[in-house]
Amino acid sequence: MSEHAAAPGPGPNGGGGGGAAPVRGPRGPNLNPNPLINVRDRLFHALFFKMAVTYSRLFPPAFRRLFEFFVLLKALFVLFVLAYIHIVFSRSPINCLEHVRDRWPREGVLRVEVRHNSSRAPVILQFCDGGLGGLELEPGGLELEEEELTVEMFTNSSIKFELDIEPKVFKPQSGADALNDSQDFPFPETPAKVWPQDEYIVEYSLEYGFLRLSQATRQRLSIPVMVVTLDPTRDQCFGDRFSRLLLDEFLGYDDILMSSVKGLAENEENKGFLRNVVSGEHYRFVSMWMARTSYLAAFVIMVIFTLSVSMLLRYSHHQIFVFIVDLLQMLEMNMAIAFPAAPLLTVILALVGMEAIMSEFFNDTTTAFYIILTVWLADQYDAICCHTNTSKRHWLRFFYLYHFAFYAYHYRFNGQYSSLALVTSWLFIQHSMIYFFHHYELPAILQQIRIQEMLLQTPPLGPGTPTALPDDLNNNSGSPATPDPSPPLALGPSSSPAPTGGASGPGSLGAGASVSGSDLGWVAETAAIISDASFLSGLSASLLERRPTAPSTPDSSRPDPGVPLEDAPAPAGS
């Protein structure tokens, strides 16, 4: 970000002399006193440059445009699916359970299942001595299908839902019944049944304890259980054929079941509790009022979460990089190093705590994890891939716009279809990354390669041959063109600042190479990175205390390892 901004010409140079000092000119003033940060930035920049060049050679422009269009088309399709599902199922009430609204047992459990082409009766009453309103009683032969979940399915993130709920345990009066307390709320240790992933079963009850009872205990205590079977091929509440296709192939029926049960819970004073039998997650229905002012709260929460996660991740990256540098020093110089246990442990605990806070907000650890992953990818893209002024100025705005759209949707509609909204937001963020890379970063890199090739094809330094190029670049026809060898220094990292003439050198170089004045810092910086190809091959040497391996010339008091050996004759001319 700010470390990539172009710096004024005479600032870091100290006014004139052309040695290795102007290496860091285009990256702006040295805001990072730690040299390891500069080394890390140059390393990532060189890796990004090599990957971009390889990408441009492997894939032609037509393929790149086609790939970019495909990503945009995919994002628009997912957005259309989200809008369609929201209009069809969220704006209109789900009436799949309207036929049992007045008949389901308030003192028992309502079990709702989704079965394709089921031959069972739509409504069955279990574990009741007599029928309820003429309902059919289920024979005992089907009892084996109603087994309890395994312990493994309850050891997931659903524990956080159970901590917010106080189970209502009623102590029996007699001592004989008190001995069977552990059987009233069983938690079987042996797996009873593993539900397939295509099963959709939820249970709803006004009493939380009824949801924790096994099927055998419910039958022994004669707790009525009404089983409602919904068939997507027959019931009209699942929408038209296209809606059923989306639900069956992409979204699933969990949200439909929860919305149907929520319609029943809205008419009850005690909103009750819901259990997803397949996943083992427990939910509690609460009354929430969401106004349009919730968008402001969503924006504030997004800014806090995004900045906190970005800061913690950058700090962890820095600590890991420092440890790698210390390890290389130990291997080369046989030095004893101290493992930075305290900083790494601090940042790990901070990230775990941040994920826990985000999980409480989103009511889902998976959503919180993917949001952290999205912020990390966006932060890496901004720090490594954004070098042109257009990308640095505008890409973050697109990222915050798409990211805020997810937060606003989640916060406004209470987390319904949040997973699909997060996928939509990420696809648009991904398209913005590809678009800015194809239209701004990659053309600047390819143009700088053409400039580098043009400069490499110039004749070697001589008394008469190089005079045409400096005269054209500097617009000076006088004799001072001979002692000014700075234009050939564009091959190395010292080509970034202007020579003695303030703004004439970079301005004329941009005019001769057709480069805009706003991107001159990026052009010079990329030229320095091209010359730093040897920096990757000798990584361990450049990460340590950088010492001149060749005898220093009288004019270069601080040689830089990024300067290639081909540039050695340049200071000699001064």
Curated annotation (Swiss-Prot):
Glycosylation positions in this chain: N180
GO cellular component: endoplasmic reticulum; endoplasmic reticulum membrane
TM stretches of this protein: 69-89, 293-313, 337-357, 417-437
Region of interest (Disordered), residue spans: 1-27, 461-515, 546-574
Subunit structure of this chain's protein: Interacts with ERLIN2.
Residues modified to N-acetylserine: S2
Gene source species: Mus musculus (Mouse)
Protein name, per record: Membralin
Stretches with biased composition (Low complexity): 461-470, 491-501
PANTHER family on file: MEMBRALIN (PTHR21650:SF4), MEMBRALIN/KINETOCHORE PROTEIN NUF2 (PTHR21650)
Membrane topology reported for the UniProt record: Multi-pass membrane protein
Biological role: May have a role in the ERAD pathway required for clearance of misfolded proteins in the endoplasmic reticulum (ER). Promotes survival of motor neurons, probably by protecting against ER stress.
Gene: Tmem259
Compartment(s) of residence: Endoplasmic reticulum membrane
Keywords from the named record: Acetylation, Endoplasmic reticulum, Glycoprotein, Membrane, Transmembrane, Transmembrane helix
Membrane keyword on record: yes
Taxonomy, superkingdom: Eukaryota
Effect of gene knockout: Lethality typically occurs several days after birth, associated with motor neuron deficiency and paresis.
Family under the similarity heading: Belongs to the membralin family.
Tissue expression per record: Detected in brain, spinal cord, lung, liver and kidney.
Classification via Pfam families: Membralin
The keyword Protein transport is annotated on this UniProt entry: no
